[in-house]
Structure formats: structure tokens, C-alpha cells
Amino acid sequence: MRQMVYALQFIGKAVPANEAGTVLNASLSAPQCTITTSNDSGACEGVIRTGAGPQATFESKVTFIGDTAFQEEGTITLSDKGDSIRFSTVGQGYLGTSADPKVKHGCVAWRIDSGKGRFEGATGLITSNFLVTADGEVTDHHFGLIFLK
């Protein structure tokens, strides 16, 4: 199997799917990008530069199972040809407070459950490190390692 690595910054919105607010539907998109990390000045710094071209899309259902714990499942489409992966949470995700009182900070790991197109038969794991505002605005940083058939 061949390995494929991807890193993208998705931006979008999460909205309540029930009255209690314990289920959210997230819809995000990510332009092509270049991510550079350097340690030239002795201080690690990262830069994300967006580029032109087709955008990746992300749709998920988030179900809270506690004050800070959640389960998630969804689809990430990584091409304009419909090549996509279905994923679900490994263990549970975490969403809590951050040093910035305007945003919550969370993380989650997903397993790839299935794929379509070039991702047919794919397996792998994806990590997500994200921020959410009180209005449901989401900035989500993905790093995935996918094994392609």
C-alpha cells in the first residue's frame, strides 16, 4: 500500500442539530495550501499560505457525550472528482476552554472507515486540532496519513 500525507486548514460553521445543542452539524471547506514550519530564528514558527484550485470539503455530525467529550463521524472530499473518505472518532474527542476566552479549543483523532474514488479501500488516521467561537465559526487543522490500495 502507498502512503499519502495531507495537511489542510478547514474553515466553516458548526450548527446545532437538536434543541439541547448536544448534536452539531459541521460544514467546512479548505483551499489548497502550503504549510511551512521553520526554526531559523530559534523560535518555531508556522505559516499557512492558501492557493488556487479546487477546495476540499468536510461534513460531519458531532455528538457530545459529556461536558467536553464528543464522538464524530463524517465525510471529507479531497478532490473535485468526488474522491472522499468516511471517518469516525477513535476513542473520544475533546473540546474545552482556551487561553483566549473568545474561543474553545479541541482535538480529535479519526479512523478512515471507507473511501470512494482513489480512496476506495483506503485506511489510516487523521488528527484534528480546532477552534470554535460562540457563534459556531470553526477553524480546523487536519493532518492525515492515509494508506492507499
Question: What are the functions of these language-model segments?
Answer:
Residues 1-149:
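Beta-strand-enriched cores of mature, soluble protein domains
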